[in-house]
């Protein structure tokens, strides 16, 4: 067997490799599942952060999602990318969790790494802008917010988002249009030019 196809961690780096991993998971390969888990845990965490804003809920949804991947790997038919299939599971689980979870959204400050330490004014401005964007995103309806973040933060196509959210592509286009329009209004005056 080719050493590249024998290493699950290497397979998790390409769409074709991910599909191979899902096939191996369906056959009970724990190493393949571990590789997929490691690849998707942080991606799903970032996706769900902007949806739920609850660390405990995020971890629970990610784990539930990946457990569903383990259990239902045999049902993956290859009609979409593995990422689309997994994000769709996470989206549905998050929607269910949010309906059952009636707690206020946490507006805590995120720790930002890699900020230019020599320029405190830039660091402050970056944090201010990040909070403004987060606050504006939080005001969008869940469907618009989800479509927008899948486009912006996860670089997914409208067709992939439509698969994840189980709706027509035109609905995604409309949601993105309204999200951009609303964000432009909410962020008007927030962006300042630096000298």
Q: Where is each model-derived feature located?
A:
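Internal acidic/polar
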Residues: 2-7, 14-18, 96, 101-130
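Short, small-hydrophobic-rich alpha-helical interface motif
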Residues: 25, 40, 44, 48, ...
